[in-house]
Amino acid sequence: MDDNKISLATTRRLPLYYRCLSELNEKGEDKVSSAVLERLLKIDAATVRRDFSYFGQMGRRGYGYDVKILLELFNDVLKQDTAANVAIVGVGNLGHALINFKFHKTGNARIKMAFDVNPEVVGTIQSEVPVYDINEIKQRVRDEKIEVAILTVPNSQAQRVTDLLVEAGIKGIMNFTTEIIDVPYNVTIHDVDLSLELQALIYSMDQD
């Protein structure tokens, strides 16, 4: 397998496959076909087969795919056995909602801390997550070996905060602002613009 050849679209589908395969495994299913995955995930069967082909000849004609083998493969690829330390920067409405969502209690992400400038929030514990002053980012991130940051600050602060995170050694940033931020080549950015996602959904509805 050559990770450099895996498309971004395929990479984003891998967690969906992993979750679906986990559910099938829990139900005692030994095998699954691309047609079944199409029905369960609403992903075209040809796309499923193409995605899986990145990892070699995983299936057999007339049999399908071995659920446990796929599950072990994606568990390794997605590093499910290794939890990444995550920090949320900006504990406004969205940041607070992400903390309360508690996704850090499952999967391979663990929210260790949050940062904000609001004195009413700084120094509090939000759903077991301590909130620190944003000026402590560099020291806290280094000390706690934070690898990933979720950015939910105002657009005007996005680049400044990103620079602090990069200086602290952050390797990945999930950017919920609409600002296009600059980072070094060795830092991965994943932009999440909810307004664009909504526009894409409405467009897709019109095509049906």
From Swiss-Prot:
**One Pfam entry name:** CoA_binding
The protein's predominant localisation is: cytoplasm
InterPro entries in the record, alphabetically? CoA-bd (IPR003781), NAD(P)-bd_dom_sf (IPR036291), Rex_DNA-bd_C_dom (IPR009718), Tscrpt_rep_Rex (IPR022876), WH-like_DNA-bd_sf (IPR036388), WH_DNA-bd_sf (IPR036390)
GO function terms (MF aspect): DNA binding; DNA-binding transcription factor activity
- DNA-binding region of this protein: 16-55
Q: Which residues bind NAD(+)?
A: 90-95
Keywords of the record, alphabetical order, are: Cytoplasm, DNA-binding, NAD, Repressor, Transcription, Transcription regulation
Q: Name one GO cellular component term.
A: cytoplasm
Claim: Transcription regulation is one of the keywords in the record: yes
List the GO biological process terms.
negative regulation of DNA-templated transcription; response to redox state
KW Transport (keyword) present: no
Q: Where in the cell is it found?
A: Cytoplasm
Share what the entry says about its subunit structure, partners included: Homodimer.
The Swiss-Prot or TrEMBL record describes its family as follows: Belongs to the transcriptional regulatory Rex family.
Q: Could you tell me what this protein does?
A: Modulates transcription in response to changes in cellular NADH/NAD(+) redox state.
Protein's name according to its UniProt entry: Redox-sensing transcriptional repressor Rex
Species annotation: Pediococcus pentosaceus (strain ATCC 25745 / CCUG 21536 / LMG 10740 / 183-1w)
Q: What is the lineage of its organism?
A: Bacteria, Bacillati, Bacillota, Bacilli, Lactobacillales
